[in-house]
């Protein structure tokens, strides 16, 4: 069996009202004098004062760059500025876009990357993979974060929709792992049982606790820890296999056909409903869990048109033809896609 490299975060801190400790956290990871921060404008307004005070106390100079979009030009512009600043660390603060951009820039410049999520909408906060706009409408491999720093109090203040989206990304591990097993059985590809079990555990945790979440509200810290665990599973696997299967290809296909429809985790959750039925899994259980946590289970809820959904299912596998999924075993037509969506009440 060929070897693969595991890149894991060195330190993960999850706390409440601990953003003031960011300076000492960074120094514990790597003694540094200059860092570059990447965030959106709203996030900067919320956390700038406390973060800069902590960095000053730790004698760290920072350069702050705003990521208004995640297209190639924005990434290249920020990357050029980070290189010129001679920063020793690249920090991504915010949701998926800023964390992904910082992760990719750190990889391109061979600089350590640190993840500081301010929302929990997907599992990329601790994984080595990024989703950016470009020629390939799917995740690219970059590098795992050197550290992950989470202030749960900040994430609690983010819109509830973002946390529910994170739940959709978690439940996607059910179909992703099954697709990985298919790849092992049909093509002989490497299958990491431990990383697969770790990813599955995050999804099973959500299903097991969905009723509690529906009655008492989503437990932010638990969801965050599950997302981090899923990200670490992909680090151990050396690929996104345990976390990303046909349901993610469906999400990427929707992005390609109609950008801006739904959040990543929302599309993955809906994709999981569809793909789980194709796989012969308990799709009704998945629907119930998603409803319990307030995540969408229908195309209408995220503004996804039936014709776009159908087309997305027919082209999803073509986005990554080398990755074996259940879609390789189905002659998916738009008519079959509509029938599948109606049978699962996605349409």
Report the location of each language-model feature.
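A short, small-residue-rich loop immediately preceding and capping a beta-strand
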Residues: 82-105, 109-120
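Short glycine/serine/threonine-rich phosphate/pyrophosphate-binding segments
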Residues: 45-47, 97-104, 122-125, 243
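ATP/NTP phosphate-donor binding region
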Residues: 1-89
